[in-house]
Amino acid sequence: MGFTKIVVTFFLVVMLAVSSSSQNAMASEIKAKINGLECFNTCTPYYDDYKCNVDCLSSGYPAGDCHIVSPSQPKKCCCY
């Protein structure tokens, strides 16, 4: 009886310690957009909206695609 009581107490203490410890979330953080879009790479026929979106997602942004930033510049991959 004494051994069982010790094992159950130890198990409950371990469960309490694990549940009260801070856990890191596995999801990536989403970066806030500041002053509109965050633009990086130049878009080409090879580097299109899909690849731009994948790069933005892997960088922590919720989405991205190719935008015309100014009329005199080529399209840029912008994350938002």
Curated annotation (Swiss-Prot):
**Record flagged with keyword Repeat:** no
Q: Where in the cell is it found?
A: Secreted
Supply the alphabetized keyword list: Antimicrobial, Disulfide bond, Fungicide, Plant defense, Secreted, Signal
Q: List the disulfide bonds.
A: 39-79, 43-66, 52-77, 56-78
Signal sequence bounds: 1-27
**Cell wall biogenesis/degradation keyword on record:** no
* Main location group: secreted
Coiled coil start-end: none
GO BP field: defense response to fungus; killing of cells of another organism
Name a single GO cellular component: extracellular region
The family annotation for this protein states: Belongs to the DEFL family.
Question: Mind telling me what this protein is named?
Answer: Defensin-like protein 50
